[in-house]
Amino acid sequence: MNIAILSKGETLYSTQSLLKAGTKRKHVMEVLDPSHCSLSIENGKSVVRFHDEIVDDLDAIIPRIGASRTYYGATLVRHFNAMNVFSVVSAEAILQTRDKWTCSQLLSRFNVPIPKTILGSSSNLEYLLSNFKNESVIIKILEGTHGNGVILADNYLSALSTIETLKTAGVKFLLQ
Protein backbone atom coordinates (compact mmCIF):
# COMPACT_ATOMS: atom_id res chain seq x y z
CA MET A 1 0.00 0.00 0.00
CA ASN A 2 1.03 3.60 -0.55
CA ILE A 3 0.61 5.41 2.77
CA ALA A 4 1.27 9.05 3.63
CA ILE A 5 1.71 10.40 7.12
CA LEU A 6 0.28 13.90 7.34
CA SER A 7 2.78 15.55 9.66
CA LYS A 8 4.56 18.85 9.94
CA GLY A 9 7.44 17.17 11.77
CA GLU A 10 9.12 14.53 9.64
CA THR A 11 11.89 14.19 12.24
CA LEU A 12 9.53 13.70 15.19
CA TYR A 13 9.90 10.39 16.99
CA SER A 14 6.24 9.43 16.44
CA THR A 15 6.46 10.15 12.72
CA GLN A 16 9.73 8.24 12.38
CA SER A 17 8.23 5.28 14.28
CA LEU A 18 5.25 5.16 11.92
CA LEU A 19 7.55 5.37 8.88
CA LYS A 20 9.68 2.49 10.17
CA ALA A 21 6.67 0.33 11.06
CA GLY A 22 5.08 0.84 7.64
CA THR A 23 8.32 0.21 5.77
CA LYS A 24 8.93 -2.94 7.82
CA ARG A 25 5.55 -4.21 6.61
CA LYS A 26 6.54 -3.49 2.99
CA HIS A 27 4.33 -0.41 2.54
CA VAL A 28 5.54 2.56 0.51
CA MET A 29 5.68 5.34 3.09
CA GLU A 30 6.03 9.11 2.77
CA VAL A 31 5.46 12.21 4.87
CA LEU A 32 3.34 15.08 3.58
CA ASP A 33 3.49 18.35 5.48
CA PRO A 34 -0.12 19.61 5.49
CA SER A 35 1.08 23.20 5.23
CA HIS A 36 2.48 22.36 1.78
CA CYS A 37 -0.75 20.78 0.56
CA SER A 38 -3.23 22.76 -1.50
CA LEU A 39 -6.79 21.64 -2.09
CA SER A 40 -9.00 22.18 -5.08
CA ILE A 41 -12.05 20.79 -6.81
CA GLU A 42 -11.49 20.45 -10.54
CA ASN A 43 -14.00 19.07 -13.03
CA GLY A 44 -16.07 17.77 -10.13
CA LYS A 45 -13.18 15.90 -8.49
CA SER A 46 -11.21 16.59 -5.32
CA VAL A 47 -7.52 17.26 -5.96
CA VAL A 48 -4.62 17.53 -3.51
CA ARG A 49 -1.33 19.04 -4.56
CA PHE A 50 1.86 18.74 -2.54
CA HIS A 51 4.41 21.35 -3.62
CA ASP A 52 2.35 21.79 -6.82
CA GLU A 53 2.51 18.06 -7.65
CA ILE A 54 -0.82 16.22 -7.78
CA VAL A 55 -1.14 13.51 -5.13
CA ASP A 56 -3.17 10.71 -6.69
CA ASP A 57 -1.43 7.48 -5.73
CA LEU A 58 -2.29 7.05 -2.05
CA ASP A 59 -4.23 4.16 -0.55
CA ALA A 60 -4.26 5.52 3.01
CA ILE A 61 -3.26 8.44 5.20
CA ILE A 62 -2.22 8.65 8.83
CA PRO A 63 -3.07 12.15 10.10
CA ARG A 64 -0.75 13.62 12.76
CA ILE A 65 -2.37 17.05 12.89
CA GLY A 66 -1.19 19.61 15.44
CA ALA A 67 -3.69 21.61 17.46
CA SER A 68 -2.88 24.85 15.64
CA ARG A 69 -3.90 23.27 12.31
CA THR A 70 -6.99 21.36 13.45
CA TYR A 71 -9.54 22.87 11.07
CA TYR A 72 -7.29 22.68 8.01
CA GLY A 73 -6.16 19.17 8.97
CA ALA A 74 -9.76 17.97 9.21
CA THR A 75 -10.52 19.61 5.88
CA LEU A 76 -7.52 17.87 4.32
CA VAL A 77 -8.65 14.48 5.67
CA ARG A 78 -12.16 15.03 4.25
CA HIS A 79 -10.62 15.94 0.90
CA PHE A 80 -8.58 12.72 0.83
CA ASN A 81 -11.72 10.77 1.80
CA ALA A 82 -13.51 12.34 -1.18
CA MET A 83 -10.67 10.93 -3.30
CA ASN A 84 -11.39 7.44 -1.85
CA VAL A 85 -8.23 7.49 0.27
CA PHE A 86 -8.67 5.69 3.59
CA SER A 87 -7.77 7.59 6.77
CA VAL A 88 -6.98 5.88 10.08
CA VAL A 89 -8.56 8.88 11.85
CA SER A 90 -11.71 10.63 10.66
CA ALA A 91 -11.99 14.38 10.28
CA GLU A 92 -14.74 14.35 12.88
CA ALA A 93 -12.51 12.54 15.38
CA ILE A 94 -9.76 15.12 14.88
CA LEU A 95 -12.22 17.92 15.62
CA GLN A 96 -13.69 16.09 18.63
CA THR A 97 -10.32 15.56 20.28
CA ARG A 98 -9.63 19.28 20.40
CA ASP A 99 -12.53 20.05 22.73
CA LYS A 100 -12.20 18.67 26.27
CA TRP A 101 -15.94 18.81 26.94
CA THR A 102 -16.74 16.86 23.77
CA CYS A 103 -14.11 14.28 24.74
CA SER A 104 -15.63 14.02 28.22
CA GLN A 105 -19.07 13.44 26.69
CA LEU A 106 -17.74 10.72 24.41
CA LEU A 107 -15.89 8.99 27.25
CA SER A 108 -19.05 9.11 29.35
CA ARG A 109 -21.10 7.68 26.50
CA PHE A 110 -18.88 4.60 26.53
CA ASN A 111 -18.79 4.36 30.34
CA VAL A 112 -15.12 5.29 30.64
CA PRO A 113 -14.60 6.56 34.20
CA ILE A 114 -13.47 10.18 34.45
CA PRO A 115 -13.38 12.63 37.36
CA LYS A 116 -16.54 14.63 38.08
CA THR A 117 -16.59 17.20 35.29
CA ILE A 118 -18.78 20.30 35.05
CA LEU A 119 -19.05 22.59 32.04
CA GLY A 120 -18.36 26.15 33.14
CA SER A 121 -21.34 27.71 31.43
CA SER A 122 -23.53 28.56 34.40
CA SER A 123 -23.94 32.17 35.43
CA ASN A 124 -24.11 30.95 39.04
CA LEU A 125 -20.43 30.54 39.88
CA GLU A 126 -21.09 29.69 43.51
CA TYR A 127 -23.24 26.75 42.40
CA LEU A 128 -20.49 25.48 40.12
CA LEU A 129 -17.98 25.52 42.94
CA SER A 130 -20.36 24.05 45.52
CA ASN A 131 -20.00 20.75 43.66
CA PHE A 132 -16.43 20.47 44.90
CA LYS A 133 -17.02 20.95 48.67
CA ASN A 134 -13.91 23.04 49.42
CA GLU A 135 -11.60 20.67 47.55
CA SER A 136 -8.99 21.81 45.06
CA VAL A 137 -10.49 22.40 41.64
CA ILE A 138 -8.82 21.85 38.30
CA ILE A 139 -10.00 24.40 35.75
CA LYS A 140 -9.36 23.46 32.12
CA ILE A 141 -9.75 25.64 29.09
CA LEU A 142 -11.68 23.58 26.53
CA GLU A 143 -9.14 23.84 23.73
CA GLY A 144 -5.76 23.79 25.51
CA THR A 145 -3.17 21.11 24.71
CA HIS A 146 -0.07 19.66 26.37
CA GLY A 147 -1.00 21.07 29.78
CA ASN A 148 -1.57 24.61 28.50
CA GLY A 149 -4.75 26.10 29.88
CA VAL A 150 -4.87 23.88 32.98
CA ILE A 151 -5.17 25.75 36.28
CA LEU A 152 -5.11 24.29 39.78
CA ALA A 153 -7.18 26.37 42.20
CA ASP A 154 -6.28 25.32 45.75
CA ASN A 155 -9.27 26.94 47.41
CA TYR A 156 -12.71 28.40 46.83
CA LEU A 157 -11.59 32.05 46.51
CA SER A 158 -8.83 31.19 44.06
CA ALA A 159 -11.24 29.12 41.96
CA LEU A 160 -13.92 31.83 42.05
CA SER A 161 -11.46 34.52 40.99
CA THR A 162 -10.09 32.40 38.15
CA ILE A 163 -13.56 31.46 36.90
CA GLU A 164 -14.74 35.08 36.98
CA THR A 165 -11.70 36.12 34.94
CA LEU A 166 -12.27 33.37 32.36
CA LYS A 167 -15.98 34.16 32.04
CA THR A 168 -15.26 37.89 31.64
CA ALA A 169 -12.76 37.08 28.88
CA GLY A 170 -15.28 34.80 27.16
CA VAL A 171 -13.09 31.72 27.61
CA LYS A 172 -14.87 28.36 27.63
CA PHE A 173 -13.78 26.02 30.41
CA LEU A 174 -14.66 23.02 32.52
CA LEU A 175 -14.12 22.12 36.17
CA GLN A 176 -12.86 18.85 37.62
Regions found by a protein language model. Give the residues of each.
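Active-site nucleotide/adenylate-binding loops and adjacent lid/helix of ATP-dependent enzymes
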Residues: 3-8, 15-20, 49-51, 55-56, ...
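ATP-binding N-terminal substructure of ATP-dependent carboxylate-amine bond-forming enzymes
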Residues: 1-88, 102
